[in-house]
Regions:
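Structural core segment of the AMP-binding/adenylate-forming
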Residues: 157, 161-249, 253-280, 391, ...
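Conserved pre-ATP/AMP-binding loop-to-beta segment of ANL
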Residues: 99-101, 237, 263, 274-305, ...
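AMP-binding/adenylate-forming catalytic core of the ANL superfamily
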Residues: 144, 169-194, 388, 395, ...
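AMP-binding/adenylate-forming catalytic domain of the ANL superfamily
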Residues: 224, 590, 621-646, 658-681
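Conserved AMP-binding/adenylate-forming
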Residues: 371, 388, 421, 428-546, ...
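Conserved AMP-binding/adenylation subdomain of ANL enzymes
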Residues: 324-342, 352-393, 408
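Conserved AMP-binding/adenylate-forming core of the ANL superfamily
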Residues: 34-37, 85-86, 103-157, 174-179, ...
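Adenylate-forming
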Residues: 147, 189-208, 229, 371-376, ...
């Protein structure tokens, strides 16, 4: 363990949210005692945390959780009814805080604005009414392909208000990635921006969305967010500015709501349609307001895909009851969010951190900053101006972003109002962590590391602002999380030794399953260690602190963006020059990982520099520019196990020079020599 470099101040130990909770409930030993009690008496903790967070129950739950079916089938807050919109928005209006800012936003071109809690509530009610007019009923899926901004923020609450399920899509995805997720979700509506701006360039999102819809015939309606004057032309070349949009409700086929969903993750298969009708966000948001519906606590509001190492992306399911309690706990106690805070996390509406911060901050009565664009345009000081101009007090980032900023060596004072720094997405290097703490944060802010994921609905490990910190460390498991470290023999390794992060009991934010994949859910998270959640992160413990070292699987993380190799490989083998492919993440000093593709040429086909460049373009087109491969390497064969699985870890080790480890399952060792030769020659 390194020396402690940050020690808690009275702002947190006396005046913070953890301190207030401990005083109220007679916890004299601070965070450590509270964490222990929250694990040994989880029903005691979550009942009191939900009240402290401000969860509004329309009907109080019969109990906190029902785990009689085992960890994988735990039901949280059974018998209760709620709607997260009441907890996040209406509660503040009833308390007279409707004029408080809920969202500040800014675009790369300098356009900015503020929405109050009153305005978010009113706008989300009208958008919800517009969705209702399109035939959206409780349980229907509404996808959002949007950059960060007021529309993405309002859409989240609009869907929740009427019991629709939001399907967020990364704004940098290409057509294939979008289509796969739309079809898997059976989305009925897609909301897209006409365009977004990054690095001063305009990116046409509407054309990407329309191309994806050709393969996603389940979508009945396309809603386009465009500037009302000067709308961009449609793909046919005709201007859409004066073309009548399909009226809200045109072609809609109303369906009965499905409140019985809570016990069934197998929805109806998507149905084909002749093509989506188009309307605009402006028309949608002009509808009659919809009332907020009361829902069983197990009703889903979020279907968010995460990528695995094999197969299609996995659809995780988060609910009106469990998700707000989980993220409310983390943002209230670990990030110490308060009503006068402005929270800014560098993320995208397609990733878990956007709904986590949106829901967590509004539960606290705080304000969210959403920024559309790149934070280093026109230069790297843009981020500091954003933080100062909007009075950001709680800022979250990835280690990749910190490394990028550190590499440019900006000489800029720490933002004056910052009081908490957050971090997630990947492990830190000590040099980057120290820069983030000292240079960026001015040595006065705790660095709240969080480790979780899309399927977690929040975090499993986190830092606490009431405890001292050493570089790169976590204080340990989050409140209410019964986490442990286990080796391959299912025992706890010695202090300082690495094992897998596991969880022994359910938590409120845990995904309710995988969309249309009950068996896959059980196999993925509970198959290797029955009765325990296997998270796949490699972690260790030294003293009271925990450290994260990476992943067990082959997930690729490019600048904090997660991608499974199967999606990349699908794009690569779509090229006529390629017979087989393997995608791996290779350590990169700024991005965290760079994407490398290894391709076996098709019979009689060349695979040289021109073909490699073409393949790189294919991947970027299919999955988005962020996932453009750094290298495409032609190889005669890929290393495989006896059952035919590609051993990506060996390919990665050949590039990095790491030890190859166990080769007992490798059936073609000569292939390793061929890859070594290819790396030297190309």
């Amino acid at each position: 363990m390194s020396e402690y470099v940050w020690h808690p101040t009275p702002e947190f130990t006396e005046h913070g949210n953890i301190a207030a909770f401990c005083r109220k409930h007679g916890i004299d030993g601070g965070y450590r005692e509270l964490q222990n009690r929250s694990v040994t008496h989880p029903q005691w903790f979550w009942e009191r945390a939900a009240a402290d967070i401000g969860i509004v129950w329309h009907t109080p739950p019969r109990r906190v959780c029902d785990d009689t079916g085992g960890i994988a089938s735990t039901r949280w807050f059974p018998g209760g009814r709620t709607n997260l919109v009441d907890s996040c928005l209406h509660r503040h209006l009833r308390q007279g805080r409707g004029r408080a800012p809920a969202l500040r936003w800014e675009r790369e071109d300098g356009t900015k604005g503020v929405l109050t809690y009153d305005e978010v509530a009113a706008r989300s009610a009208r958008v919800a009414g517009g969705l209702r007019a399109l035939g959206v009923a409780e349980g229907d899926r509404v996808a959002g392909y949007l950059p960060a901004g007021p529309e993405a923020f309002v859409l989240l609450f609009a869907c929740a208000r009427i019991g629709a399920v939001l399907v967020p899509l990364f704004s940098g995805f290409g057509t294939e990635a979008i289509a796969v997720r739309l079809v898997d979700a059976g989305a009925r509506v897609l909301v897209t921006a006409a365009a977004a701006t990054r690095h001063g360039r305009r990116y046409d999102m509407e054309t990407v969305a329309r191309t994806a819809l050709a393969k996603a015939t389940c979508v009945r309606h396309l809603v386009v967010v465009r500037e009302e004057p000067g709308a961009p032309p449609d793909p046919s070349g005709q201007s859409r500015r004066n073309m009548p949009s399909a009226p809200v409700g045109a072609g809609a086929t109303p369906r009965a709501s499905r409140p019985s969903w809570a016990g069934d993750v197998s929805q109806d298969e998507p149905t084909a349609s002749p093509g989506p009708a188009t309307t605009t966000w402006h028309r949608l948001s002009g509808a009659e307001p919809a009332e907020t519906v009361s829902l069983p606590t197990g009703t889903p509001f979020l279907l968010l895909h995460t990528s695995g190492t094999t197969g299609r992306p996995k659809g995780t399911i988060h609910t009106h009851g469990g998700f707000p309690v989980q993220v409310g706990s983390e943002t209230r106690y670990n990030l110490d969010l308060r009503p006068d805070d402005v929270a800014f996390w560098v993320t995208d509406p397609g990733w878990i951190m956007f709904p986590l911060v949106a829901v967590g901050a509004t539960l606290a009565g705080a304000c969210v900053l959403a920024y559309q664009g790149t934070i280093d345009h026109p230069d790297v000081t843009r981020l500091w101006r954003l933080l100062d101009d909007h009075g950001v007090t709680v800022f979250g980032s990835s280690p990749s972003l910190a490394r990028m900023l550190m590499g440019r060596d900006p000489k800029h004072p720490a933002p004056s109002r910052l009081r908490v720094l957050g971090s997630t997405g990947e492990p830190w290097t000590e040099e980057a962590w120290r820069w983030y703490f000292a240079d960026f944060g001015g040595k006065r802010c705790p660095v709240i590391n969080i480790c979780g994921g899309t399927e977690v609905g929040g975090s499993l490990l986190a830092s606490a602002p009431t405890l001292p910190q050493s570089p790169c460390s976590f204080s340990g498991p989050c409140l209410g999380i019964d986490a442990a470290i286990e080796d391959d023999q299912d025992t706890e390794p010695p202090e300082g030794h690495v094992g897998e992060l596991v969880v022994r009991h359910s938590w409120p934010g845990m995904t309710r399953g995988l969309w249309r994949a009950r068996e896959r859910f059980a196999d993925t998270y509970f198959g290797r260690r029955p009765g325990r959640w296997s998270h796949g992160d490699l972690v260790s413990r030294t003293g009271d602190e925990w450290f994260v070292h990476g992943r067990l699987d082959d997930i690729i993380k490019v600048a904090g963006k997660r991608l499974g190799p199967a999606e990349v490989e699908d794009a690569v083998v779509g090229d006529p020059a390629v017979a087989e492919a393997a995608a791996v993440g290779i350590p990169h000093p700024v991005k965290g990982e760079a994407l490398w593709c290894f391709a076996v040429p098709a019979a009689g086909q060349p695979l040289g520099a021109p073909e490699a460049e073409r393949i790189r373009g294919r991947v970027a087109h299919a999955l988005g520019p962020a996932f453009r491969p750094s290298r495409v390497v032609a190889v005669p064969e890929l290393p495989r196990t006896r059952n035919g699985k590609v051993m990506r870890r060996l390919i990665r080790s050949l590039v990095t020079g790491e030890a190859l480890g166990d080769l007992s399952t490798l059936v073609n060792p000569a292939g390793l020599d061929a890859i070594r030769t290819a790396l030297q020659e190309q």
